[in-house]
């Protein structure tokens, strides 16, 4: 699962801040995935009884409330670091195009810090939750459908042959079956 989480996190970080996670052994990877998993548990329909039993909200010793506050502090720390890093790169003119930079540079957008943070949180938690689940589901599906794997392999071999690299920088996704398979898995 860490490789799938790294893919999800790298996609979210690249799209929103124009950076990637170097490896699944990095401290940033560990911190973000841990905190976002904990926050996801709080948002779960079964993970936080305080949402359904109001009396539990009055408990001053609630572990959930303390843990939620701790996760908020930790999340704010890495969000702040990612935002400062992007601000530095934008100031130097070395940033790559990304959602956050595009919104900041858009004179008509005029979003405040809270709105930018909301976009960032949506990209981060939404990406980790959905992409990770999606890729795991797709791998599970393919593991039970060797006929789909065989058809994809045959389509790739017909298109590229045995002497060409399958994943070149010039790949224009002309392999119709594989492109359709990916789109179907993304639904």
Q: What name fits each language-model region?
A:
Residues 1-135, 151:
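Cytochrome P450 heme-thiolate monooxygenase catalytic core
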Residues 30-38, 94-102, 141-187:
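Cytochrome P450 I-helix active-site segment
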């Amino acid at each position: 699962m860490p490789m799938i989480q790294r893919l999800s996190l790298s996609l979210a970080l690249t799209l929103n801040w124009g950076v990637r996670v170097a490896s699944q052994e990095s401290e940033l990877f560990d911190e973000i995935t841990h905190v976002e998993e904990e926050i996801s548990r709080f948002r779960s329909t079964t993970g936080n009884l305080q949402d359904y039993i109001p009396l539990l909200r009055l408990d001053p010793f609630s572990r959930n409330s303390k843990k939620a506050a701790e996760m908020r502090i930790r999340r704010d720390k890495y969000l702040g670091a990612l935002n400062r890093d992007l601000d530095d790169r934008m100031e130097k003119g070395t940033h790559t195009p990304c959602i956050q930079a595009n919104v900041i540079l858009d004179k008509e957008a005029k979003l405040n810090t809270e709105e930018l943070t909301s976009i960032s949180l949506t990209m981060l938690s939404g990406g980790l939750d959905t992409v990770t689940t999606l890729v795991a589901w797709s791998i599970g599906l393919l593991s039970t459908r060797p006929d789909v794997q065989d058809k994809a392999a045959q389509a790739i071999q017909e298109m590229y042959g045995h002497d060409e690299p399958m994943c070149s920088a010039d790949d224009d996704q002309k392999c119709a079956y594989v492109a359709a398979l990916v789109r179907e898995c993304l639904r």
